[in-house]
Amino acid sequence: LAASEANLAEAKKYMFYQTIGHDKLNQLRHVRFFKDINGMREHMKKHAQILRPKFETVISVLENELGGLGIGSWSKPKGGYFISFDAMEGCAKAIVAKAKEAGLIMTGAGATFPYGKDPKDSNIRIAPSFPTPEELAVAAQIFVLSVKLISVEKLLEK
């Protein structure tokens, strides 16, 4: 704030009473939009109808391509916006990098950990909510190929 000493002193009087807190106007917008808890539940059902097929696409590709191979495991969420994928220890960053080489940009490996530091370098958060179903089908294939390539490299190190 650029002002004279007198104007700064005056502004400080008013700013003194400001608090950091919840955005009350945004809360009011939500209350008016949803009306009540049932309105929110109905709205979230609409979200689920949009997101469910996307999650099913990714889970299906993971199960068909990686199921039973012992090189990864994943969550099957019944809500939320992410699938948690656990690769072999020491592989997550390399998998995300390999996917990026093929044009797939993902959330950074270990993003679910404080400061993004996964001590096992194994966790990858998959967010299937944004891409179209067509893009997601291609992205899931790129991801599983990246998992397979990096896992083979890791196994050959032993």
PLM region descriptions:
Residues E101, K117-K158:
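PLP-dependent enzyme catalytic core of the Aspartate aminotransferase-like
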Residues K12, R32-M44, E63-N64, G68, ...:
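Inter-domain helical "communication" segments and dimerization helices
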Residues A2, S84-D86, A127-S129:
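Short hydrophobic/aromatic beta-strand micro-patches
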Residues L104-I105:
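Residue-level detector of anion-binding/catalytic polar loops
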Residues E5, M88-C91, P131-P133:
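Helix N-cap motif at beta-to-alpha junctions
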Residues L1-R52:
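Conserved core segment of the aminotransferase class I/II
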Residues A48-I59, I71-D86:
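Conserved glycine-rich beta-strand-loop-beta hairpin in the small C-terminal domain of fold type I
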